[in-house]
C-alpha cells in the first residue's frame, strides 16, 4: 500500500519517533483559548512538556462545534474524541475555565488561540424550514 497513514484524532500517529516530545527547559504558564479538539490537543502537548496549562472557553461545553460532526450515521465515534482529550488533559493537571471570557488579569507567558470553526450549513433550499 502506498502513502502514509494518518489519523484524525492523533496527528503524531505513525510519527511518534520522528519528533520526540521533549520536556521544556523552562516551565511557562500557557493559556489556551478554545476547548475544541485543537485547543485540547495543544493543552495536552504543552502539559506533557511540563508547562502549567489553563484552557479557557466562553462556552460551558467542550468541543461544541466538533461534537455536531458526530451526528451523521457512521460518525458516532467522533463523539468520544473530545471526552478522551479532556480526560488526558485532566490526568496531566490541565486547568479548565469553562464559561469564562479571557481577561488581561491572567498574564500568561504564552497564549494559544484555538477558537475553532463555525458550523457549515449546506446551501439546500428549505433547510431552515420548521419541518427540517
Regions found by a protein language model. Give the residues of each.
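Iron-sulfur cluster-binding cysteine motifs and their immediate structural context
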Residues: 1-13, 51-54, 58-61, 67, ...
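Short, well-ordered alpha-helix to beta-strand connector turns
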Residues: 27, 50, 93, 108-109
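Glycine-rich dinucleotide-binding loop and its adjacent helix/turn
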Residues: 9-24, 90, 115-132
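Phosphate-coordination loops involved in phosphoryl transfer and adenosine-cofactor binding
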Residues: 26-30, 99, 129
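Cysteine-centered iron-sulfur cluster-binding motifs in ferredoxin-type domains/subunits
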Residues: 1-8, 34-35, 39, 112
